[in-house]
């Protein structure tokens, strides 16, 4: 019975709010994207664009390594280009 209630509530949420977006291509990336992992994990950054949409960019990384090791940061303009982060939509 609880499974049916959960599924009904989930589909009602999808109908009213829309399917959740896994990745937004227009997501702005900030200057603090250099993240070091403390254990084997998936890490990333969550930012907001125009105060509205939350976006997530995830990368796999290993202990004591930078999650995004090949970024190019222009600290004056706060722009960043990610070179080898695979599939930012998982």
Swiss-Prot record:
Listed name of the protein: Conotoxin Vc22.1
The organism's place on the tree of life at top rank: Eukaryota
GO CC annotation: extracellular region
Cysteine pairings via disulfide bonds: none
UniProt free text on domains: The cysteine framework is XXII (C-C-C-C-C-C-C-C).
Organism, as annotated: Conus victoriae
Keywords: Disulfide bond, Secreted, Signal, Toxin
PTM remark: Contains 4 disulfide bonds.
């Amino acid at each position: 019975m609880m499974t049916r209630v959960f599924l009904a509530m989930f589909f009602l949420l999808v109908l009213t709010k829309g399917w959740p977006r896994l990745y937004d291509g227009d997501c702005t990336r900030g200057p603090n994207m250099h993240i070091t992992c403390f254990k084997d994990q998936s890490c990333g950054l969550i930012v907001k664009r125009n105060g509205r949409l939350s976006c997530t960019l995830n990368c796999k990384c290993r202990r004591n390594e930078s999650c995004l090791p090949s970024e190019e940061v222009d600290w004056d303009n706060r722009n960043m280009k990610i070179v080898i982060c695979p599939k930012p939509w998982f």
